[in-house]
Amino acid sequence: MHPQELAKFIDHTALTAEKTAQDIIKLCDEAIENQFWSVCINPCYIPLAKEKLAATNVKICTVIGFPLGANLTSVKAFEAQESIKAGAQEIDMVINVGWIKSGEWDKVRSDIQAVLQACNGTLLKVILETCLLTPDEIVKACEICRDLKVGFVKTSTGFNKDGATVEDVALMRQTVGDKLGVKASGGIRDTETAMAMINAGATRIGASAGIAIIKGLQDNSGGY
């Protein structure tokens, strides 16, 4: 795959707590230069990214209920709404893993549905945190997302014990078919890993190592 083609798969990501305004400006500059699909940033930096990315094709993606997914549903929905007002064009929300583990699937569905309604047509990705789920739970969560017609299912926050695996991406793709996108994220730091995820069915890659990925290099910084 040509580097420019691979770049269009990448949400260029900076989500750790210590990121400064200068870090976000650098992220945006890199995204413009390398023609990444989007920058994925915390909500407080949306206005800054909007200013930096005006008149470019780079989209602004933000995270909701991040990284635990355990916020009140009303808060998640409000955060999504406010983020979109501020300029977010894609929303990555964290599913409520505790409710999945409790078997409270109706609550899981309602939580996603509320954020989806708040998005009002803005692309919604649902982060499953696959490293905490059984294969059956991954399938069930994907089925709910498919039935609700969200935009994407996403593997991971990158803030837990493990990130994306080829097996989980393949299972997610198998469950949602061609109806939804699949985003692989967490621990993807080189071209080989990114291509393995794409070959397994990923249509988006979330990574802080986007430049290393498209240049065929290894990023050993240990980031998202």
UniProtKB/Swiss-Prot annotation:
Disulfide bridge positions per record: none
Protein keywords: Cytoplasm, Lyase, Schiff base
Catalytic reaction(s) noted: 2-deoxy-D-ribose 5-phosphate = D-glyceraldehyde 3-phosphate + acetaldehyde
Signal peptide (residue range): none
Record-listed E.C. numbers: 4.1.2.4
SMART domains reported in the protein's UniProt record: DeoC (SM01133)
Cellular compartment(s): Cytoplasm
Pathway(s): Carbohydrate degradation; 2-deoxy-D-ribose 1-phosphate degradation; D-glyceraldehyde 3-phosphate and acetaldehyde from 2-deoxy-alpha-D-ribose 1-phosphate: step 2/2
Single GO BP term: deoxyribonucleotide catabolic process
InterPro entries associated with the record: Aldolase_TIM, DeoC, DeoC/FbaB/LacD_aldolase, DeoC_typeI
Main location group: cytoplasm
Its biological purpose: Catalyzes a reversible aldol reaction between acetaldehyde and D-glyceraldehyde 3-phosphate to generate 2-deoxy-D-ribose 5-phosphate.
Family in the record: Belongs to the DeoC/FbaB aldolase family. DeoC type 1 subfamily.
PANTHER family: DEOXYRIBOSE-PHOSPHATE ALDOLASE (PTHR10889:SF1)
The protein's name in its UniProt record: Deoxyribose-phosphate aldolase
Organism: Mannheimia succiniciproducens (strain KCTC 0769BP / MBEL55E)
